[in-house]
Amino acid sequence: MNKHKYVILCPDGMADTPLSELGGKTPLEYAKTPNMDSVAARGVTGLMKTIPDGCLPGSDIGSMSILGYDPLNYYTGRSPLEAASMGVELGKDDVAFRLNLVNILEKNGKKYMHDYSGGHITTEEAKQIIETFRKELGGDRFRFYPGVSYRHLLVVKNIDINGLQTVAPHDIPDLQIDEYIPHGTASSSEIVEIMKKAEKILENHEVNKKRIAAGKLPANSIWLWGQGYKPSMPTMKEAYGLEGSVISAVDLVKGIGKYAGLKVIDVPGATGYLDTNYAGKVEYGMKSLNGGDFVYIHVEATDEASHEGKIDLKLKAIEDFDKFIAGGVLEGLKKFGDYTVMILPDHYNQVKLKKHTPEPVPFCGFSTKTEKQAADKYSSVNYSETLAQNSGLFFDSGSKLFKYFLNDFNRQ
């Protein structure tokens, strides 16, 4: 274990484009973020390409890049990562699919993706639904596993996914779903059939009856996507000599942590939404550094606000992240003496589009070892997309930035 501590903070999907509603500023530029600004001023700021060419802009690809793993070498699909975090061991013939509980709106005989989260269905409600699927649709070939809120898992044995095309439901908000239904291979018909059977079950499910009676959106369909086989990747200890932890409410981020050999810490009250337990994430993160070198703290709220298309919620999520996560961590790190901290989102999530986009993201960071150097051309008065771009510091891969981070942002 090193005495020097390394911390990465990830406000998922925080990066965005200028908005007329905010006077031409991005949400990050508009929000009050004194703690993140102080990091940019004390160290460096720049851009990093978290999404390699040819990869879809998702949190799986983004977090893998941030942690120093090249997705082009190690990524096999989103769902195997989520399976790992859920303790589901995949065999060599198993394919994992993400199963979203969603709300589909039918209008004039056409179906639209109305809500990718099934009205932010609760975990307890969702467990009841997944248990029904397990009893009525499950077996040795199709295995259903409950996750958190709307995010669940289906494992299918002996299915050909070569050429199978699926799309994330949060990337098709309010769009007609016909052209996005799983397709591209003979086996896609099996996947579509499971979706149809699940939809039939959900029509009269007791959970949905209660939600409708309470004026809530029903989870009236499922959406299968993110398929893949079990990946093979070196641990963080093997690749970079670090031992540490990951803290997130999101299964795929936990799964990356597991494959990286990091300890996955479950924080009570971590919801993956704006009501998450920010203080708990900081508390558990700082405690983890007593026995480790490194911690990755991931917060989903900024991403969820963007998917909902709500500027006010995104501003709140950014300011909450700055106050409770960035501020809390900077205070907590003081007791460790020497440390290096970096802050960056995993990808853009444009609140106007309600979906992820692949632009290079802004990062900022500083190290107690190097912050007292003479004024640095990569420092900035605050942390924003524009100033990060203007700094001229750019990394075309996560592994390059991660090594720079481990070198304490040493420019020598």
Tell where the protein language model's regions lie, with residue ranges.
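Feature captures the catalytic ectodomains and active-site-proximal regions of enzymes
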Residues: 1-412
